[in-house]
Design a protein with these regions (language model features):
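Long, hydrophobic/aromatic-enriched structural stretches that serve as scaffold segments
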Residues: 1-12
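Short amphipathic alpha-helical segments
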Residues: 3-5, 87-91, 141-143
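Short hydrophobic/aromatic beta-strand micro-patches
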Residues: 8-10, 92-94, 146-150
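Amphipathic alpha-helical segments
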Residues: 12-25, 97-112, 153
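Vicinal oxygen chelate
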Residues: 15-87, 121-137, 146, 151-175
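Surface-exposed interaction/gating patches
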Residues: 74-117
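Intrinsically disordered, low-complexity segments enriched in Gly and acidic/Ser/Thr residues
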Residues: 99-143
Length: 175
């Protein structure tokens, strides 16, 4: 059905997450280890529960910079005009057991888990993952994407309803 299907995380050493996944019985469904040192793994959505999760490393010391090397974008993207109009700052997972899923992801991703009201959150340097309980659903899924709009003119040109837009069944919250 309609929902987001993949979350991609960039890190310094994707191979360490691949090893950790094996210890946690999280299966991979795709692996890539390129000659230039780029490594990536897609983890099975039934083991991650809710999405295909990809953990990628680019063999680039500046990997934490917004405009650093990204293998999957091709050879020219760093030469293109930069778009600073918006930034992705979070996602929301709808879960039939938010406590269990958030604890599993916290353990796997090495991100701190905090509880704010009845929402479990994983917090990183520049994004967060929210886990919302919905006991009426059969499957966990990515329901919302949080986007910070940095350019007011760009925001004014969008068809915004209730502080967001909907694309393929995923509500994109604009902050």
């Amino acid at each position: 059905g309609d929902s987001g299907y993949m979350l991609i995380f960039q890190c310094d050493n994707a191979l360490a997450y691949r090893e950790k996944a094996e210890k946690l019985n999280i299966r991979s469904i795709w692996k890539s280890d390129l000659d230039n040192g780029v490594s990536a793994t897609h983890f099975h959505p039934k083991d991650i529960n809710g999405v295909i999760m990809s953990i990628d490393s680019m063999n680039d010391e500046s990997w934490e910079e917004k405009y650093s090397y990204w293998q999957w974008a091709g050879n020219n993207w760093l030469n293109e005009e930069k778009n600073n109009a918006f930034s992705i700052i979070g996602v929301t997972m709808k879960c039939n057991n938010s406590k269990s899923l958030s604890e599993k992801w916290s353990l796997f991703l090495d991100l701190p888990l905090v509880l704010e009201g009845n929402i479990s959150k994983l917090k990183a340097k520049d994004f967060e993952i929210n886990f919302i309980e919905d006991t009426n659903i059969e499957f966990n899924y990515m329901a919302e994407l949080d986007v910070k709009v940095n350019d007011q003119d760009y925001r004014d040109s969008m068809d915004i309803q209730e502080n967001g837009v909907s694309v393929c069944g995923v509500k994109i919250n604009l902050t």
